Amino acid sequence: WERFENWKRQLAFMVGEPKTNGQCVLRDFTTINEITSEAVPPEDSQIAMKWWRESSHASSAAGWKMLDVIQSGISSIENYGDCLTPSGIDAILARERQALIEWENRNPADLAEIQNLAQNGL
């Protein structure tokens, strides 16, 4: 997680603050929110996920939400498409650390599966 945070911080500093027109240059769609933490239905379920086609490809619905944020600068989903800037990155990362702790507490089975995959590989 620390490497991921450092990468985001480096990106924010490379891109810098919004330019004179105030438009955000770098948006973050990886934060913990209702899209990125959508519950996975049981394997034998016929229920389709709204935001994901599979684990690494977002659905067209998520893609349209991204485009809406990029074009309007406004997100209807909390913490989706944050503007990463040198002046705001620390607050975003602190919020994300707390959100991750909360997600882990709500999803112990998913956390155990992820940890197992990280230790033993796919």
Which stretches of residues belong to each language-model region?
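Extracellular glycan-modifying ectodomains
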Residues: W1-L122
